[in-house]
Every structure is written in C-alpha cells, then in structure tokens.
Amino acid sequence: MEEKIRLTQYSHGAGUGCKISPKVLGTILHSELEKFYDPNLIVGNETADDAAVYDLGNGTAIISTTDFFMPIVDDPFDFGRIAATNAISDIFAMGGKPIMGIAILGFPTNVLPAEVAQKIVDGGRFACHQAGIALAGGHSIDSPEPIFGLAVTGVIDTEKVKRNASAKSGCKLYMTKPLGIGILTTAEKKGKLKPEHQGLATAAMCQMNSIGSQFSQVDGVTAMTDVTGFGLLGHLIEICEGSNLSAVVFSDKIKTLDGVKDYIAQGCVPGGTGRNFDSYGHKVGILTEEQKAILCDPQTSGGLLVAVELNSVQTVIDIAKDAGIDLYEVGKLKPKSESDIVVEVK
C-alpha cells in the first residue's frame, strides 16, 4: 500500500506561523534610502495595512497584496485552498472586491511527486473560484520545502477603503471567526488531536472573509484587518498604533474553537505564539498563560477584526447574521494611554 504523504512533515513552519516576527520584520523594513513618494499610493507599508492601495483618480482604487506560506495541513488540496483563501482575505480586509489571483509555488521536485503540487494548485484554484475570480497565472521555483500562496489584485471605491489608521475612539471591536487555529493545528501535528476535533481548524481556515466587502459599505466601520500570524493582540496593536489609540480586550468574550483550552494544557502551543509575545508583550497588560496562548496564537486565514462606531453596530450585526457569520464582540477602542500599554486585557 502506498504511504500517505503528510505535507507538514516537509516544512519547518506552518501557515501564518511561518511569518517573521514583528520585531525582526521591523529591522528588515527599516531603510536609510530616501522614500519614493507617489501621491496616488494612498495605502503603503507605513501603517502595517493588509494590502497596498493605488488611487486611479476616477473614484476607483486598485488593491494589491501577496501572501504565501508552508503547509499547515497534510492534505495537498486543503493546503492550496487554505493558502489561497488566506491571500484573498487581504483584499476583503481592506473592504475591496478581488478580481484576479496569481499563484506563487515553491516545490521540492526531487522529494515529492508533481501530482502533489498539482493538487495544491487545484486547491488554490478552487478557492479562487469560490471568491469569483480566476487563477490567472503564476510562477514556480524548485525549493527545499513546499510553499504556496497568491498575489491578488482587487478593486474598491476609493472613499470606502478601510485603513488601520482610520479607527476611532469609542468603536466596538468585533471578530468574525473564533481563535485557536494555531493551537489545533499544533495538536494535530503532535498527534494529540481528538477525532471529534478533526477538520475544525480546516473548516475555519477555508471560510472566506468576503463579508469584508459588505462591511466596507458601512460608514461606521472605521477600520478592518484580518487576524493572521501575529495573533489577535498583534493585529489589534497595528490598528491602535496606526490610529494613535489604545484598546481594551474582554477576555471572557473571546470565542475559541472546541478543545482549544484542553490542548493548551497539553502544551500544544505553536512556536509563533512565543515569538509574537516577545515582539509586543511589553505593549499589553498582564496576561495569564492561557490568555497569552489564545490572544497571541498565530492564526492562518483567521477572521476579520472590525472596528465599529456605536451607531452602526446593529447594521454590522445584521449584515453578519444575513451572511451566516457568528460575529462576536472582543473589546473596544479608547483614547491613547499615557503609559506604554497599548492593549489592556480584562
């Protein structure tokens, strides 16, 4: 009998947990070179937004993003689908509509059969079709580990762009997916995942964040991002620092995937959690070990974090309900604290 290939055994990292830590990334992106100024580039990398946005000058803007990583699941088709869903999410997180995807593939051709890569790309193509776009091309290289993702192009009405820098004090914070993806996938890699929890993380990662396009039509949605490799706290800090605000997170309102707390107790915490906390732990209040494991857990293809003004809360809740999204409140934004603490966890 042919032995089943487990893709996660061919990579040192998994999904968005492969991300370089925020601290190290800051060093990499620092440059002494004079910045090139383009007045039409209305969102660049200054505010850690999910994608770049270029104003065409006719009321429409182009959104451009890329995202790729190593396998977080063993099944090739699911890996391709998750990676593509995650990449497309950046367009939705800016409030836009995707129009085209380009594949990015790295594959160890001397280790794994080409048929595995074919299934990975097919998974990506399936996700693109779900989003209503074509997988229009791509580029591939021979690499030591499997890598897959997309470069995605989208469009948006220029005035509807949701930036990290546009959040307002007093906004309530909502999430569209439960946390714990990194914990469940780590439990699976360690062989500790119970049968009743099989597929939970994959289902969450394959849920398309297309609701972001609808949220962007609500003026009271002041900022939006997808929660991925830096965890909920890391991406919330990006919004706070971009908008010169602070935040409070209500730990008792955080929703997690089934079994997450039991797996934390068994030590199924991904390495990315510690790297995340090392990068921004000094910016958050005191956390229990369980809170740290959940709030710093690197999500792959995680949910949207949405900042909503009070007069638009019901509208956003209704949009989510109509779309079958289990929206839940996680905190609120407040004026910038005088201390170094950006996010307080209660």
UniProtKB/Swiss-Prot annotation:
Which Pfam families does the UniProt entry name for this protein? AIRS (PF00586), AIRS_C (PF02769)
| EC category | transferase
Q: Could you provide one GO biological process annotation from this protein's UniProt record?
A: selenocysteine biosynthetic process
Task: Keyword check for Cell inner membrane, yes or no.
Answer: no
UniProt GO molecular function: ATP binding; magnesium ion binding; selenide, water dikinase activity
- The protein depicted here goes by the name Selenide, water dikinase
As to how many cofactors bind and how, the note says: Binds 1 Mg(2+) ion per monomer.
Binding locations of ATP: 19, 47-49, 67, 90, 138-140
In terms of InterPro entries, this protein maps to: PurM-like_C_dom, PurM-like_C_sf, PurM-like_N, PurM-like_N_sf, SelD_I, SPS/SelD
